[in-house]
């Protein structure tokens, strides 16, 4: 009995010996130290850590941060996250801080308008870089440009002879390109709704995807890359209306194309590969192999920053950029690109009919991670604007969330009752919207890993979804021929 009592006293003193202060260092996710090691109380909260971090970094405006110890996020306080008994008081603990978006995008909760007009299914949707305009492509062979203030069509653009499969805004917002099932590409003037020059013809099959050269590489936005079912990727000068280059190398349909910020073009194909080309001369730089079936789509880590060019659509709402010269705008676009991709090493992720995704870096042939877990075809994949996360949409009715740095699985969002066709991110990287065959849109919260909002309203399958780059609204369209706008 005495021995037992002694033992209890010992454990009591052990508990008392648990450290009440912990030596810690605040380190950025790229490894830079915010300051020297400091003694922190074990009960310190994330709010208090935020104040210390902002003070150490001498931030003029308070930035919200996430904090991690190893893989574990500090949700409430340090002692909740750490196993205090096993903490070595001699050693300094690294607390990694990650800046979050300063602004918050509110979850869209209601349909603000239903815009009929198309006579066939709406196949593609794309907001302009500043979020002020919306373009849609439809099975009725037309492209429509919508005025988002009055929520009516500005222009109905006629010229294609077949289904319009993709629409893409130039990064300066002054041109719109559309590609159709017949293989022709038309450039439109969004101010007038008129064609600019002759259609760009040369492809022998349908156009699957279009990508413009980034603004910081050419503020004139003259060059456009197209991916076609004929197995080729072509580069066009839209001002001259000429094909500058035909990049042949895939042995089956090219499903997607991305124009990176470092002078490289990435293509995915039904030949099961992703290829990387030099934009200047069309030379093949790398072939990324690994998928066992068609590659349906690719996403680039720099997609959001390249889409929005010189300005951040939320932070730069003041429209001060209207007075800037082209050189200043180009400089601003380059700065934004370099902030996301300082060493020009872009990451890309490919999704396939083999139910997997692969994460690649443009400076190595071997994949960083084979991302498995989906039980069916993976149709769409997108990087979050802050490049921390990846979302994928699958025919297995789920959306999955992955860590962008190493492709590790994070969460599964279940709720759709049929195939998920497409996903889009909010500008603050906190929300994902998905569109499905089950006729609904769903908004998911990254923080809670749960459904944030159910958006029923379409009468049939949802093919296209886009979240405005300024976070203000979501647009969706599909088989019921109606475009719906959703807002808070």
From Swiss-Prot:
GO (cellular component) term, any one: nucleolus
Record's keyword terms, sorted: Notch signaling pathway, Nucleus, Repeat, WD repeat
Top-level taxon: Eukaryota
Biological process according to GO: negative regulation of Notch signaling pathway; Notch signaling pathway; positive regulation of Notch signaling pathway; regulation of Notch signaling pathway
Chain segments carrying region Disordered: 1-22
Pfam families the UniProt entry points to: NLE, WD40
Alphabetized PROSITE patterns for the sequence: WD_REPEATS_1, WD_REPEATS_2, WD_REPEATS_REGION
Segments annotated as WD repeats: 117-156, 159-198, 202-246, 249-287, 329-370, 373-412, 415-454, 457-488
Keyword Nucleus tagged: yes
Positions of the UniProt region annotated as Ubiquitin-like (UBL) domain: 19-101
Cysteines joined through disulfide linkages: none
Gene Ontology molecular-function annotations: Notch binding
Annotated SUPFAM superfamilies: WD40 repeat-like
Entry's localization field: Nucleus, Nucleolus
Role: Plays a role in regulating Notch activity.
Family according to the record: Belongs to the NLE1/RSA4 family.
Note: The name 'Notchless' derives from the ability to suppress the wing notching caused by some Notch mutant alleles.
Subunit and interaction comment: Interacts with Notch (via cytoplasmic domain). Associates with the pre-60S ribosomal particle.
Protein name: Protein Notchless
UniProt source species: Drosophila melanogaster
């Amino acid at each position: 009995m005495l021995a037992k009592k002694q033992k209890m006293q010992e454990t009591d003193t052990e508990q008392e010996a648990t450290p009440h202060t912990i030596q810690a260092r605040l380190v950025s996710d790229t490894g830079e130290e915010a300051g020297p090691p400091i003694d922190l109380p074990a009960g310190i909260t994330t709010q208090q850590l935020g104040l210390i971090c902002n003070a150490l970094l001498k931030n003029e405006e308070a930035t919200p941060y996430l904090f991690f110890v190893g893989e574990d996020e500090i949700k409430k306080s340090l002692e909740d996250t750490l196993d205090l008994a096993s903490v070595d008081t001699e050693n300094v603990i690294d607390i990694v801080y990650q800046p979050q978006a300063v602004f918050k995008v509110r979850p869209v909760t209601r349909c603000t308008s239903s815009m009929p007009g198309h006579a066939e299914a709406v196949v593609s949707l794309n907001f302009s870089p500043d979020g002020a305009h919306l373009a849609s492509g439809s099975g009725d062979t037309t492209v429509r440009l919508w005025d988002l203030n009055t929520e009516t069509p500005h222009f109905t653009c006629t010229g294609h002879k077949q289904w319009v499969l993709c629409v893409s805004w130039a990064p300066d917002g002054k041109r719109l390109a559309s590609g159709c099932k017949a293989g022709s590409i038309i450039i439109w003037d969004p101010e007038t709704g008129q064609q600019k020059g002759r259609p760009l013809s040369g492809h022998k099959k349908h156009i699957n995807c279009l990508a413009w050269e980034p603004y910081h590489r050419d503020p004139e936005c003259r060059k456009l890359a197209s991916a076609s079912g004929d197995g080729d990727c072509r580069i066009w000068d839209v001002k001259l209306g000429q094909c500058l280059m035909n990049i042949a190398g895939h042995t089956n349909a090219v499903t997607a194309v991305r124009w990176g910020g470092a002078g490289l073009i990435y293509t995915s194909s039904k030949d099961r590969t992703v290829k990387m080309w030099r934009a200047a001369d069309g030379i093949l730089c790398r072939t990324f192999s690994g998928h066992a079936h068609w590659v349906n789509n690719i996403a680039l880590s720099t997609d959001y920053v390249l889409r929005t060019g010189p300005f951040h659509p939320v932070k730069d709402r003041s429209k001060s950029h209207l007075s800037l010269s082209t050189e200043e705008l180009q400089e601003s676009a380059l700065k934004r690109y370099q902030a996301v991709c300082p060493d020009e090493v872009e990451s890309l992720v490919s999704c396939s009919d083999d139910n997997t995704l692969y994460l690649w870096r443009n400076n190595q042939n071997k994949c960083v991670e084979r991302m498995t877990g989906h039980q069916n075809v993976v149709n769409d994949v997108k990087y979050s604007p802050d490049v921390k996360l990846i979302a994928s949409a699958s025919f297995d009715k789920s959306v999955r969330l992955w860590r962008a740095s190493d492709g590790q699985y994070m969460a599964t969002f279940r709720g759709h009752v049929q195939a998920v066709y497409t996903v889009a991110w909010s500008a603050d990287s906190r929300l994902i919207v998905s569109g499905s065959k089950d006729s609904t849109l769903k908004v998911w919260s990254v923080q809670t890993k749960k459904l944030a909002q159910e958006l029923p309203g379409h009468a049939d399958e949802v093919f296209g979804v886009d979240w405005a780059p300024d976070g203000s609204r979501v647009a969706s369209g599909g088989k019921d021929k109606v475009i719906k706008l959703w807002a808070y």
